[in-house]
UniProtKB/Swiss-Prot annotation:
Residues 1321-1337 have a biased composition (Basic and acidic residues). There is a cross-link at residue 1567 (Glycyl lysine isopeptide (Lys-Gly) (interchain with G-Cter in NEDD8)). Belongs to the cullin family. Pathway: Protein modification; protein ubiquitination. The gene is Cul7. This is Cullin-7. GO terms for biological process: epithelial to mesenchymal transition; Golgi organization; microtubule cytoskeleton organization; mitotic cytokinesis; negative regulation of insulin receptor signaling pathway; placenta development; positive regulation of dendrite morphogenesis; protein ubiquitination. The keyword DNA repair does not apply. It comes from the Eukaryota. GO terms for molecular function: ubiquitin ligase complex scaffold activity; ubiquitin protein ligase binding.
Length: 1689
């Protein structure tokens, strides 16, 4: 099963060194399906943790709360089950129950009630005075009672809440401190009580007005203590914003409200119905109302959290002038803020006829330094992104641009770019066509975060995870989630406006019942009505709610289309076509205000029209008597649009030369602090500018003094800003300022003391921010889990926005030198800066001895390296590093931890040294130990350090993957349990998996913003759900059969019946195919590493892929399990077939058909995947391996025979020949399984024999080479290939022999010419006679030469002579000699018959053939003497009876063998001849001679065999034509048919004996070497040496082996493979080439002797040859009417 079972509990692996363990049952509830569900706390344990179930677990430990069903509890949490198998319910008994007597407890409750009344009375009496001592004593006694847990119930009275509220709002510090003591005592019992107390206090009306800084901090500290143990989460490496206390308190209120509602939803029915005095009555409602209230509260919390985290400001563009919870929709649609920059000097793409023409224009016009804009989406770059053109070359893509959106260069195509020109040429214009084009390409994104959201359309592969069909009726209405998101804004309207919405819904929906406000959540609202509501809502909502509306998903889906063209909303494109004219008219009527300060006026002008409020504020504050009404009006505008105010404060971060601007701004801010309404402005968002101004060494003293006055005034007014200054490090900055100016700055010391006192509060604020954010993330993960479990939609407003912000930055990469503090080098430090200048043409070059060069990085605190890359260049030759070692240490003196060792290839340019470190190393040292080609010094082109992403994505990804992995592994375990109990439930697995994967697909498309986030979820789902299920269903059970194997076996069994679509077998097969398709094809689109995964770019841009791994395709474990299961099924199927049918005559065709069926089934089940086809072949091979040796030899002989028959049958041509070729092809595909098996040697033996007979009897053809090319791996010794190669060598010898004959002829002709001259001078008459004789000799020699010349053009044996060739031959010779072609073969490659079949040319061939043979023998001897080495033994020819001939008999051409040719030519001189005399002359074995006589005496043959009493064997004579008419002309094939061997005969047993003897030798040699083992090559050599010379089998065994006594290295390797499979030999994975002896073999080892005891050395090698004879004329034939035989070929 998946995971690990310890202490009978299931442990789920969550990551490297992490696993989850079920610890405790927290609560139970009734699920949506009516079945009970149980919340289990899973502890996250690291490697080495004990995890003992009896040990107590600290609740601060990292854990995950997971709701589980009965089946999941039964499969994963055995400890939670009772003896009867039922889940043990959680205990509700108090730990101190029974400790107090009921009477004593009643008396204490009475005392508490009286103490509460007394404290309230005393508190009212001392209002405005110093609290009396009795009041403090009363509160102290109440705190003591509150610490007793059994009395917790009495403190849930509402009067206690009122008492605490009065005490917290008291101006006296002691009373507030006592209230804190009582709250701590009440909340010390359990988290539920603590949460209820905090909730009840925070929900009081206007509590913020009654609480001062200390009281608020007391409640915040209590909340921090309450949430610290609930959601332990670390945000190390992520820069959290500074959140003021008032905003934190508001977040705490929202968070407490949400957690309370969530706790009520997760409670059982009894808890939901119980009344609680601590909480308001409006929250004690039913479940349906609770779900609505929870969704609305969660949406409000997300809205405020996004604003507090300043995610909207970080994601908005700099020119955006709005500050909202989310990036505002108006800021994107206002024409004056969303202008497109372009230059009118360059032509747009729309003015060209084609992309190619435009690409040429851009290529010729564009110059380095010009600005460009992207026109379409391309990999990482989106349409609308701008950048600076750098360079171009001939690569693909050709243009390199530095993009503003990514911060690095990226290569794109010419036609994708629009030229903007140099900066001075660019104008802010709007082009309608361009706007439409960019809108179509996605440049005008309407998603609130500027991070481009690219929905994942294929998280899993189609078409197997098919999305659900969209219901047309549902598409016409809003979903409940969309309606509730719209309802979120309706709830923010006034009472009258809500009633108007209800009336509108009543009119449109035509409901029979009368609607009221409480019935709105249950309505089904049409899309048209929702669009009308979206049209009216912007006019009624406040500014903050309006910006939230523009950011929600329902507005993005339905709002923009309906609002286009309506004048009621000016922010929609096209809504106000005369908007520019209206603005111009208003500007003409009301000229802009001018500031008295020129510096401030420049700031106002840079802000545009929105900056005019700053001028109004300056004028209102600058008058002698500040105009309070005008100032408040300006403050109200700045609260709605705070960008001008933030720009005013951030101007302090400008250059110190702007002294006038700084003083003006500080005086405005100083006056602004005096107004209470000004404290509502977001001062905290720009406080960093003040700290930067403090830290700047160039800041003027006057500016510093004014800044300190302002900060002192601000922190005195609200101590929250002192806390923020502490968080920003202002204390150290003020100390440095005091030290520089020697303490002459007024109020600086006081400001520093005030900031220092807030250290504890700063820590509290940071902890609260972390806890709230971590708690929200946990609640979001809980909602995702509930969404997975129930498949109910997530109905929380802004849920998608929150996830997008959490995932924002997952596709961003940062390569900046801010990850290290400094870089040190071993030599030439003046060039160290070249390592970080990002210029590949510069380099740092070392100077020193080899191996002493290093680069040291001093890392910034907390930076964990994600990737460290070294840039090198191959052109540096010997200066290029070859061996690099990376070490880490805590100090420069202790860099001794080796982190990685890298060998650098000479062709490398980027060398990854480190990836995904898990801890922080202060010092990283790169040591260059060796250079290429033995170089001394080294050159490094650059360093790139990729640190942790400064976003929340790594944290959220880790939590999302952990929860997802735990959920799906628990579910996979439960499903596996069902399958183990009933295999038939495996048929339902495809629908289960399909539903789960479709759910994740839909979730990713709606909520996950980019590819990496979707891939992280996809990879986790795959590893947690599919991988364990595949492992379980492919693991064999008690009967050694896996569940999937049983299912596949059933599929193969009913395959034929499944062709009927109406049968049950068809439905069954369909389910099996759907399951296998899903398991194989549903895979992650990108293989992602465990820590980070970035999509790999293509082509030129691949250099920016920092952390790409592997990886597409199925995980190796899944593929291995599936292929192993399929292999075992195929093996079992084929083993049954082989066992039952190996003796059948039609075994091979049936085997090929079975193989084809399995191959087709593999494609049906798993698609065209090579891994499963290979598994199918390996399964067939495993089945063959299980056969005994003789049966396997029989199988191999049958295949060799079948191939031989199909090759010979294909020669007949026509339809029958094509059918033979098709059968041959199917057989060749099936026989390929022999290639890795021991049986391949046996198959090669038989194939070699049949191929030799085929080549020598009918000749070679193109099919021989094609067959060998396809099944070549099945021949370990490559003997068939060598046989074909020897034919080519023989043809070359034949051509050389032809040249040799011509040379001999030329010499003879010269001699004849000299003789002729001498005879003519001496005797004229006798000279004439000599001349005729010489001409006769010349003609005879020339005939032989031409015959051989004619053979030079022949490439294949058995090819008929062409007409053109005949004409060429007749031109010189008139056919006086038959053509003789000699085929020289070697016994090393060709199977040669015994010596008794050797041909004696002197006695068996006619004289006219013997001459050619003698000439060839002389030629071969001379060629061998010239080409051979001195020490090499001389080769000699031995003529055999093998071969073929063409004999002319009257008008017929008889195709016969060499033996038949000799027999027919023998009858030219005799009318009849006895078989006995023929055998005596030829010395042929009787069976060979009778095999040759059979076809000659058949009905097609020319001979008759007559039996005579006195002549054994009969008499042969030429058949009389009158007795039996025969065809007079044409070709007649009389070559004896092929004879096949029997594997069960003596030869097969000899092969088995040889294998056993080789096994003995292998085992004996390995035994002698013991545990040291032996290299496989050395073992083969020793075995061959022992076979030739050493101790070998007894003489009887050797003689019984016959021709099988020869041994080759392939035979030895085959035996080694056999012994490895049987387990007799073993080898280690790290050294697979070394073999060891494992166990004794079962083969008895015989006594060994020499195979050739009397030989002093090896015999000289023999070379066998055969004949090919051809002739045109028959001058020696009889001229009578009797038919005679003449050798034609």
């Amino acid at each position: 099963m998946v995971g690990e079972l310890r202490y009978r509990e299931f442990r789920v692996p969550l990551g490297p060194g992490l696993h989850a363990y079920p610890d405790e049952l927290i609560r139970q509830r009734v699920g949506h399906n009516g079945h009970p569900e149980y919340q289990i706390r899973w502890l996250i344990l690291r490697r080495g943790d004990d995890g003992d179930r009896d040990s107590t677990v600290d609740c601060k430990a990292e854990h995950i709360l997971l709701w589980m069903s009965d089946d999941e509890i039964y499969a994963n949490c055995h400890k939670m089950l009772g003896e009867n198998g039922q889940v043990i319910a959680p205990s509700r008994e108090s730990t101190e129950a029974g400790a107090l007597d009921k009477s004593v407890l009643g008396e204490m409750e009475t005392d508490v009630k009286s103490l509460i009344q007394r404290a309230l009375r005393q508190l009212e009496e001392c209002v405005g005075t110093v609290p009396p001592a009795p009041l403090l004593h009363t509160v102290h006694v109440l705190s003591a009672y509150a610490s007793i847990e059994p009395l917790t119930g009495i403190f849930k009275d509402r009067r206690v809440v009122n008492l605490l509220m009065h005490m917290l709002s008291s101006p006296d510090y002691q009373i507030r401190w006592s209230a804190g003591r009582m709250i701590q005592a009440l909340s010390s019992h359990d988290a539920g009580t603590r949460t209820q107390i905090l909730l009840s206090l925070s929900q009081q009306e206007a509590i913020e007005k009654h609480l001062d800084f200390d009281s608020r901090c007391a409640l915040l500290a209590l909340f921090a203590q309450a949430t610290l143990t609930e959601h332990p989460m670390s945000f190390e490496g992520v820069q959290l914003p500074q959140v003021p206390g008032r905003l934190l308190f508001s977040l705490v209120k929202r968070y407490l409200h949400v957690t309370f509602l969530l706790d009520r939803l997760n409670g059982d029915a009894g808890d939901q119905g119980a009344q609680n005095n601590f909480i308001p009555e409006e929250l004690n409602v039913g479940r349906g109302r609770l779900e609505l209230e929870f969704s609305m509260a969660m949406g409000t919390l997300i809205s405020e959290l996004v604003q507090a985290m300043r995610w909207d400001g970080a994601s908005s563009r700099p020119e955006s002038s709005s500050s909202s919870t989310f990036q505002p929709r108006p800021a994107q649609f206002r024409p004056y803020t969303q202008r497109f920059r372009r230059s009118r000097r360059f032509r747009p793409r729309a003015s060209f006829a084609s992309f190619n023409t435009y690409a040429l224009y851009v290529r010729d016009t564009l110059r380095p330094g010009m600005r460009v804009r992207m026109l379409e989406n391309y990999e990482e770059i989106a349409a609308g992104d701008e950048g600076q053109f750098r360079q171009s070359n001939d690569g693909v893509p050709p243009a390199q641009v530095l993009w503003d959106s990514t911060g690095h260069t990226y290569w794109v195509h010419w036609h994708m770019l629009e030229i903007l020109g140099f900066e001075e040429d660019i104008e802010d214009v709007i082009d309608i066509e361009e706007l439409q084009e960019l809108g179509a390409n996605g440049a005008l994104s309407i998603v609130p975060p500027s991070q481009r959201w690219k929905p994942i359309t294929q998280l899993f592969a189609e078409p197997y995870v098919v999305p659900e069909e969209e219901d047309r009726e549902e598409s016409e209405n809003l979903t409940q989630a969309e309606w509730w998101e719209l309802l979120f804004f309706i709830r923010q309207l006034s009472e009258a406006e809500r009633l108007h919405i209800v009336d509108l819904l009543q009119d449109h929906l035509e409901e029979e019942r009368v609607l009221d406000y409480d019935m709105l959540p249950e309505l089904t609202v049409p899309v048209d009505l929702a669009q009308d509501l979206l049209l009216s809502l912007p006019q009624q909502l406040e500014d903050s709610a309006l910006r939230d509306l523009f950011s929600c998903s329902v507005y993005r889906k339905y709002g923009p289309e309906v609002l286009v063209g309506h004048l009621s909303y000016p922010f929609v494109p096209g809504a106000q076509p005369n908007l520019f004219g209206a603005n111009e008219e208003s500007e003409a009527k009301d000229p802009p205000l001018q500031s008295a300060s020129p510096a401030l006026q420049r700031l106002v002008e840079s802000l545009g029209p929105e900056g005019e409020v700053l001028v109004e504020l300056e004028q209102a504050l600058g008058s002698e008597a500040p105009q309070e009404t005008e100032v408040k009006s300006c403050l109200l505008q700045l609260q709605e649009q705070p960008q001008p105010f933030l720009a005013l404060m951030r101007s302090l971060d400008t250059s110190a030369s702007n002294k006038t601007l700084h003083l003006t701004v500080l005086r405005i801010l100083m006056q602004l602090v005096n107004f209470p309404e000004a404290l509502l402005l977001p001062w905290h968002e720009a406080m960093d500018a003040c700290v930067t101004c403090l830290r700047s060494p160039n800041t003027d003293r006057e500016v510093l003094q004014e800044l300190i006055f302002f900060l002192h005034r601000l922190t005195t007014t609200s101590r929250d800003y002192a806390v923020i200054l502490n968080q920003l490090g202002a204390r150290d900055a003020i100390s440095k300022v005091l030290e520089k100016h020697r303490g002459k700055l007024e109020l600086a010391q006081e400001l520093r003391d005030m900031v220092s006192k807030c250290e504890k509060h700063a820590h509290l604020y940071r902890k609260l921010t972390t806890n709230i954010l971590g708690g929200c993330i946990q609640m979001v993960l809980g909602q995702i889990e509930d969404h997975r479990r129930t498949h109910r939609p997530i109905q929380i407003p802004f849920f998608d926005v929150f996830l997008r912000y959490l995932c924002q930055g997952s596709s961003e990469e940062m390569k900046k030198n801010r990850y290290w503090e400094k870089v040190e080098v071993s030599s030439n430090p003046q060039r160290a800066s070249r390592l970080t200048d990002r210029n590949p043409k510069t380099y740092w070059e070392s100077s020193g001895r080899a191996g002493s060069h290093f680069i040291t990085l001093h890392m910034r605190p907390g930076v964990i390296i994600r990737q460290l890359t070294l840039l090198v260049a191959g052109e540096d030759s010997s200066y290029m590093p070859a061996w690099v070692v990376v070490c880490g240490g805590n100090s420069i003196k202790s860099v001794n931890k080796e982190l990685n060792t890298v060998n650098v290839m000479p062709s490398a340019s980027r060398v990854t040294l480190l990836e995904n470190l898990t801890r922080f190393w202060p010092i990283i040292q790169i040591r260059i130990k060796r250079c290429q080609q033995g170089g001394i010094n080294t050159r490094i082109r650059g360093l790139e350090v990729l640190g942790p992403k400064p976003t929340f994505w790594p944290v959220f990804r880790e939590q999302l993957c952990r929860h997802t992995r735990l959920f799906y592994m628990v579910r996979a375990q439960a499903w596996s349990q069902d399958i183990a109990e009933d295999r038939r439930s495996l048929l339902h697995l495809s629908s289960r998996l399909n539903g789960a994967l479709r759910h994740e697909q839909n979730f990713a498309e709606r909520f996950l913003p980019d590819m990496e986030a979707a891939q992280a979820l996809s990879k986790t789902c795959w590893e947690a759900l599919v991988s364990p299920l595949v492992q379980n269903i492919t693991s064999p059970d008690e009967d050694s059969t896996s569940s999937l194997g049983w299912l596949l076996d059933q599929y193969l069994g009913c395959r034929e019946a499944a062709y009927n679509p109406q049968s049950r077998a068809a439905a069954f097969s369909s389910r099996v195919r759907r399951l296998t398709h899903l398991l194989v094809h549903v895979e992650p689109r990108e293989a992602a590493p465990p820590v980070v995964a970035i999509p790999r770019s293509k082509g030129r841009n691949r250099i920016h892929d920092w952390s790409y791994l592997i990886t597409r395709g199925l995980p190796s474990s899944i593929m291995k399990n599936l292929t192993r299961c399929w292999r075992s099924v195929v093996e079992e199927q084929m083993n049954k077939f082989l066992t039952a049918s190996w003796k059948d005559d039609d075994f091979v065709p049936r085997y090929c058909e079975r193989y084809y069926v399995l191959q087709k089934s593999s494609s049906e089940l798993f698609g065209p995947r090579a891994a499963f086809l290979l598994a199918m072949r390996n399964g067939c091979a495993d089945a063959v391996l299980r056969l005994p040796f003789l049966r396997a030899a029989h199988v191999s002989e049958q295949f060799a025979r079948h191939i031989d028959q199909r090759i010979q049958g294909s020669r007949m041509g026509g339809a029958r020949g094509m059918e033979m070729l098709a059968q041959l092809q199917r057989c060749l595909e099936s026989v390929l399984i022999f290639s890795p098996l021991e049986i391949a040697t046996t198959f090669e033996h038989y194939y070699q024999h049949y191929m030799a007979d085929r080549l020598l009897s009918v000749g070679s053809s193109w099919l021989e080479g094609a067959v060998l090319e396809q099944i070549g791996p099945c021949f370990p010794s490559r003997l068939p290939q060598q046989m074909l190669q020897s034919l080519n060598v023989s043809e070359e010898l034949q051509r050389q022999f032809h040249v040799y004959q011509l040379q001999q002829l030329d010499q003879e002709l010269l001699k004849l010419e000299d003789t002729e001259k001498k005879i003519q001078v001496a005797h004229e008459d006798s000279g004439r006679e000599d001349k005729s004789k010489k001409e006769e000799a010349i003609g005879e020699a020339a005939a032989v030469a031409m015959a051989e010349e004619e053979d030079q053009g022949k490439k294949e044996e058995g090819e008929e002579e062409g007409e053109g060739e005949d004409e060429e031959e007749e031109r010189y010779y008139k056919g006086t000699m038959p053509e003789v072609c000699v085929l020289v073969v070697t016994p090393r490659f060709w199977p040669v018959a015994s010596v008794c079949q050797m041909l004696n040319p002197a006695t068996c061939l006619p004289a006219y053939l013997r001459g050619t043979i003698n000439h060839y023998t002389n030629f071969y001897s001379k060629s061998q003497s010239r080409s051979s080495l001195e020490k090499e033994p001389q080769r000699r020819l031995q003529w055999t009876w093998q071969g073929r001939a063409e004999v002319q008999f009257g008008g017929q051409i008889l195709h016969v063998s060499t033996v038949q040719m000799w027999l027919l030519l023998h009858l030219n001189n005799q009318k009849e001849v006895s078989v006995e005399s023929l055998q005596a002359i030829s010395e042929l074995p009787p069976d060979v001679l009778h095999r040759a006589i059979g076809p000659l005496t058949s009905s097609r043959g020319p001979l008759d065999l007559q039996e005579q009493k006195n002549v054994p064997g009969g008499v042969l004579k030429i058949r009389d034509d009158s007795e039996e008419p025969r065809p007079r002309r044409g070709n007649v094939w009389l070559i004896p048919p092929q004879t096949y061997l029997q594997a069960e005969a003596e030869e097969g047993r000899n092969m088995e004996k040889r294998r056993n003897l080789l096994n003995c030798l292998v085992v004996r040699i390995l035994k002698a070497h013991g545990d040291e083992g032996l290299h496989v090559d050395r073992l083969v050599y020793l075995v061959l040496e022992a076979w030739e010379k050493g101790p070998c089998p007894a003489r009887g065994l050797v003689s019984s082996l016959g021709r099988g006594a020869t041994c080759r290295s392939s035979d030895v390797l085959s035996c080694i493979l056999h012994l490895l499979v049987k387990g007799t030999l073993r080898r280690h994975d790290d050294r697979p080439q070394v073999l060891y002896y494992a166990v004794p073999v079962t083969v008895m080892e015989p006594h060994m002797e020499s195979l050739n005891p009397g030989s002093a050395g090896p015999n000289p090698p023999l070379t066998f040859h055969t004949l090919q004879i051809r002739s045109r004329g028959v001058p020696y034939a009889s001229c009578t009417d009797n038919h005679t035989f003449s050798t034609f070929r």
